[in-house]
Amino acid sequence: MNRNDVTEKIITVKVSKGIQWADVAKKVGLSKEWTTAACLGQMTLDDKQAKVIGKIFGLTAEEQKWLQVVPYKGSLPTPVPTDPLIYRWYEVVSVYGTTIKELIHEEFGDGIMSAIDFSMDIQRQADPKGDRVNVVLSGKFLPYKTY
C-alpha cells in the first residue's frame, strides 16, 4: 500500500457514492481547493483531518496514516500535460508567464509568489455568453535576499 493507492480509493469511493468535494471540505473545515488537493495526494493532513476523510471515504487506520505522510508534490504524469483542462493552464503559463513574472516583479521587486503560503478560490461566474471559470490565486510574496 502507498499514498497513490489511498488516492485511488478516495476517487473510487467519491465516484461510486456521488460525493462532492465541497461537501468533504465542509466536514473537514477547510477550503474545497485545499481539501481536494489533499485527497488527490498533494497535501499532508493532520490526524484529525485524516480521520474525517477516513470516515467519509471508508479508509482503514493504515490508509489514514498515508494521508499524514508528506507527499511527493506534483502530480502530472508527463512534462507537458495531456489532459485538455490541465493543458490550458500550461498554455496560460506558456503565453502569460513572462507577463505575470514581469508585473509581479514591477509591483513587488525581485522574488517569487509562494505556493506554500498560498490560497486558491475557484468559482462559477454566470455570463450570458456562457459561464466562466473564475480562479483566484493568492500567494505570499517572498523577496530574494542578499547575503
UniProtKB/Swiss-Prot annotation:
Secretion signal, residue range per the UniProt entry: none
Pfam family, one: CYNS_N
GO MF annotations, alphabetized: cyanate hydratase activity; DNA binding
Domain of life: Bacteria
GO biological process entries: cyanate metabolic process
Keywords from the named record: Lyase
Enzyme active site: R88, E91, S114
InterPro entries, per database record: Cyanase, Cyanate_lyase_C, Cyanate_lyase_C_sf, CYNS_N, Lambda_DNA-bd_dom_sf
Major enzyme class: lyase
Catalytic activity: cyanate + hydrogencarbonate + 3 H(+) = NH4(+) + 2 CO2
EC number: 4.2.1.104
Keyword DNA-binding on entry: no
Function: Catalyzes the reaction of cyanate with bicarbonate to produce ammonia and carbon dioxide.
Family: Belongs to the cyanase family.
NCBIfam families in the cross-refs: cynS, PRK02866.1
Protein name, per record: Cyanate hydratase
